[in-house]
Amino acid sequence: MKQYEVTGMSCAACSARVEKAVSKVPGVTSCSVSLLTNSMGVEGTATDQEIVNAVVAAGYGAAPKGAKKEQTAAEEEEALKDHETPKLRKRLIASVIFLVVLMYFSMGHMMWGWPVPAAMKDNHVAMGLLQMLLTIIIMVINQKFFVSGFTSLLHGAPNMDTLVALGAGASFGYSTYALFAMTGAQVRGDMDAVMGYMHEFYFESAAMILTLITVGKMLESHAKGKTTDALKSLMRLAPKTATVVRDGKEVTVSIAEVRQGDIFVVRPGENIPVDGIVLEGSSAVNEAALTGESIPVDKQKGSSVSAATTNQSGFLRCEATRVGEDTTLSQIIKMVSDAAATKAPIAKIADKVSGVFVPTVITIAVITIMVWLLAGKDIGFALARGISVLVISCPCALGLATPVAIMVGNGMGAKNGILFKNAVALENAGKTQIVALDKTGTITTGEPRVTDILPAEGYTKRDLMQLAADLESSSEHPLAKAVMEHAKATGISQTAVHDFQALPGNGLSAVRGEDLLLGGSISYMQQKVSVDAAMTEQAKKLAEEGKTPLLFAKNHTCAGLVAVADTIKEDSPQAVAKLREMGIRVIMLTGDNERTAKAIGAQAGVDEVIAGVLPEGKEAEIRKLREHGRVAMVGDGINDAPALTRADTGIAIGAGTDVAIDAASVVLVKSRLRDVPAAIRLSRATLRNIHENLFWAFFYNVIGIPLAAGVWYPVFGWKLNPMFGAAAMSLSSFCVVTNALRLNLFSVHGKANKKAVPAAKPTEMKISESEETKMTKTMHIEGMMCGHCEATVKKALEALPEVTSAEVSHEAGTAVVTLSSEVADDVLKKTVEEKDYKVTAID
C-alpha cells in the first residue's frame, strides 16, 4: 500500500470527497483516506502524479509519504506532531479578546446597564458600525472557515467549514443589511424603525459561532493528537545515533548511516540502534518496548537483538543484520501506521452518510427558512432557525467515530505485542466464534523437555541422568537434545564414551569405561534387557499422557526411565479457559497420533482435538470449520500459512523479530497463548467503542437538527439560539474522540480469572489431584539486585525436574520453590550458586 499525506481536509465530507476522486483514477484498486492522520493509502498501478492530480482537482493537496527511502522515525514522528492545536489556540485567544469587547457593546448596556462611551450613547449607527467592525475582525481571524468552506462549495463538495461559513455569513450579511436599513430610517427620522432594526442585529451571533466552533476544533484537535500517542511513543524509541566500528575505531554516526554488515557496540544502559546478531559479550536486554514483556532476556554470542531494546548490564559487540525501514521497530511502526490508514467495514455506513451529509443539511436549512416565512414568521426568526440548523450539524462526529477508535485500539495492541495489520483485522478478530490452535509451538513450547525421571532400584535420579546424558551425547536426535539440555541445567557433565551406535528400531548403545550403555524405546529395550512389570506399566502410563518414555540400561540391567515431551506452555490452560469463558469454541489441530493429541488437548482443556492432520491438510480443516462460524487460526505462520490465510482471522504467534508475516492478519510478537484472548478482547472493546461513537454521532444529529429547525416550537415553544447550536456542534466531535481515548484505560488481559475452569477432563483431574501432594521450600538468597537476577534464578530452579515453579523476589531475597517430589537442599543450593548467587538458608 502506497501512503500519501493529504492537506486541506477539515471534516468527514472532505475525506469522502478525496476518496471518491482517487478511486476514479484508472489503475487504483482501493483507496482509504484517514481524516485522523491526514493520510491516504492507495493500492493499484496508478502513478504518484496521477493520484496527486486527482486530489488537487478535488480541491485538496497531496504528496507521497516517505519520498526518501531512509526517512527516519524522527521525521515520521514530526509529521504526526500536533501542529494544529497551537494555531487554533492563538486564533481562539484573539477571537475571545474581540468577542468580549463585542459582547460588551452589543449586550452589556442593555442587559446589565454597563456604561458606554458618550460618543456611542444613543448613537445607534455608531454602535452598529462598531459591532460590524469587531465582527469583521473576528471573521478575518477565522478566515480559514470561509476560505475552506466556499472553496469546497465551488468544487461541488461542501464540507463542515461550508456550514460554519454559511451560518456565520448569513448572520453577518443580514445584520449588515439591518444596519444600512437602520441608517436610512434614522436619516428619515423614523425612530420606531430604527429601534426595530436594532433588534435585528446578529453580529454577536456570527462572532460567537466562529469562536465556539474554534473552541470545539481546538479541543478536537488536542484529543485527536492523543490518539496517536502510542504510535509516537514507538517512534521515539528509535535511537538517533549508533556507535560503529570503522577502521578499527569506535565512531558515533547517525542511525541513517548504519549499513547492513556494520559492526556496532552497545554499552550498559544504551539502546540497541539496529537489529543484529551478537558477536561478542553477554548481557540482559529489556525488550519491553517491542513485546510488552518486562522481564529482561539473556543475550550471548549468536543471539539476535532488536533496535530500541535496552542493554541493561553487559557489553555487546554486534553485527547489523537489518537497518533503516527493515528493522523490527520500523516494521511495527509501519504496520500500526498502515492499519490507521485503512478502514473497517463498520465505517462504510458512516462514510456513505458523510458523503451526502452537508448538501442535505444545507437543503434542510433553506427549507426551514422558507417554511417559517410561509408560516408568517419574520425574517429574523426564520433566519435564526436556518442558521441553527447549519451550525448544529456535525459531519465530523460521524467521520471520526471509527478511525479514532481504530487508532487507539491499534496503539494499545502494539504496546502489548499484539499487531493488527489493518482495520479489517481489528474488527474481525472480535467476531471470532471458533479458535483453531496449532499444537506445536502454539499450545506447546515446540521443544522437547525432560518431564519425568524414574530410576530403577539401586539408582538415583542423578545416576540415571548421568547415564542418559553420556549415551545421548553422541546422538543428533531431538530427544537426545532434550536430555542433554536437562543434564546441563542440573550441573551434570558428560563422561566420554566410545563405540557409539544408533541401532535400528529406536535404540542407542555405547561403551563408557568397561560398561555397556543401552537406551531407547520401551519396545526396543524389552528385547535387550529385563524390564519389570511396574516399569512397563509406568512407561505405558507416560505414553498415554503424550510423553515419550526412554528406557536406559547399564550392562543389560535396567537403570530407569526418562520421559521426554513437547510440554505445554505455562499459560496455555489459562488461555484456553479464557477463550471458552468468552464463549469461543477451542479446537486443537495436530499431526500427532490420536493418543498423544488427546493427552495434550486434555492438559490444555480444549473442546475438540483433530489429530493426524498434515500441514497441507490444515487448510481443508479450516474450510470445514468455517461452515460452523467465524474462525481464527493460530499458528507460527510458517508451515501453516495456507490455514492462516483461509481463516477469517489468521493469528501468527511467537513472531519475535519477524513481524512481517504475510499469511497472518494479526501478529503476536511473544510466544504467549494468552495474547490470543487478549487480541480478541481488545477487538471487542474497540468494536464496542465504535458502536458507542456511531450511536452518539447519529443520535446527536437526529435529535439536534429537528430541534434547531424549530420542529418543537409550535408544540412546546422550544427554539434554539444559533450560539447554543454552535456550542453543541463544537462539543460533539470532542465527545467522540474523548470516548475513543477511554480505550487507553482498557486492560487487554483483563482481571485474573477466578472462575473454575469448566468441565475438567480426566487428565486435568489427575493433574489437579497431584497438586495436593506438592511441597514448598523457601530459599534465602544473597546477591540478587534486579528483575534480571530474579529471572536467572527462576529459570535455573525450574529446569530441575522436581521443581514445579519458583517465585523469586530480589527485594525479599527469597525464592519460594514448589516441588512435585522431594529434592535435596544441596541440589537446590548448588543450582542457584552456579549462577553466582549465595544461598544462606533453606526453610
Predicted regions and their residues:
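Conserved ATP-binding TGD loop and adjacent catalytic N/P-domain core of P-type ATPases
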Residues: A16, T29, P268, T342, ...
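Juxtamembrane coupling segments of multi-pass membrane pumps/enzymes
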Residues: E76, M182-A185, D190-A193, A207-P268, ...
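Conserved catalytic phosphorylation-site environment of P-type ATPases
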Residues: L290, I349, A384, A397-L471, ...
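Transmembrane helix-loop-helix hairpins at the membrane interface
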Residues: K87-T241, K352, G717-P722, A728, ...
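Flexible metal-binding regulatory segments at protein termini and peripheral loops
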Residues: M1-G128, S233, K249-E250, K334-T342, ...
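Conserved cytosolic catalytic loops of P-type ATPases
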Residues: P26-E43, D48-Q49, E200-F201, K232-D326, ...
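ATP-driven catalytic headpiece of P-type ATPases
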Residues: K90, T309, Q433-E476, N506-I587, ...
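Membrane-embedded alpha-helical bundles of multi-pass transporters
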Residues: M111-V125, L154, G173, M412, ...
